[in-house]
């Protein structure tokens, strides 16, 4: 199942902290891909995503949780360093990166504050919950801004995204290390069902063949999880008695 073009990768968090991190990663990636705003549709998509990120950041102690995880990953690398045959140059490089990310994150302004204080984002956020509430008569500020030179708009967006760099860099290295901590292993589900112990994992990663058009419904926590495979076509689709897939507990 190594052909990535014929498979699809799903990820499922096993705790609230990981759920928040995956959502932040998803939103940060969207913001980065939408940074060129040249029409009302792209602008609204960007500002809606920025609004979602503000909401996610306000729900917990994001900086504290990330700093704790950066420290935890450094401790794990220290354990690796004591094992025979380990690539010490790689371990030292990762530890240096983790320390650097932690230092930058610690000294950074409050995460997301630049987004919250941005006047344009604030004005747009007030209208997002209103159906059709972003017309030119609702948001003349936005429509005027969209008629500014592209370079001026780019500078505005670049400044906002740069303010998120400490968050983005810390989150990226943490999630990369967590994802790499557990290899994908071949598994088989019986009659569309699979369950196992999570053993304190944070994240499940599951790779499925695109055919026969199934998706996983996952429930679980840090000690145990269950996966039920369901057909995309709920009326005519079928689930094979034995389904091969790959699974990683990270």
Swiss-Prot record:
Assembly information from the UniProt record: Interacts with FtsZ.
Family, per the entry?
Belongs to the ZapD family.
The alphabetical list of record keywords is: Cell cycle, Cell division, Cytoplasm, Septation
* Pfam families assigned to the protein according to its UniProt record, in alphabetical order: ZapD
This chain is encoded by the gene named zapD
Q: What does this protein do?
A: Cell division factor that enhances FtsZ-ring assembly. Directly interacts with FtsZ and promotes bundling of FtsZ protofilaments, with a reduction in FtsZ GTPase activity.
Kindly list the places in or outside the cell where this protein is found, as annotated in its UniProt entry: Cytoplasm
HAMAP family from the xrefs? Answer: ZapD (MF_01092)
Report the principal subcellular site: cytoplasm
**One GO BP:** FtsZ-dependent cytokinesis
Could you identify this protein by its name?
A: Cell division protein ZapD
- The protein's superkingdom reads Bacteria
Name the PANTHER family for this protein: CELL DIVISION PROTEIN ZAPD
A single cellular component GO annotation: cell division site
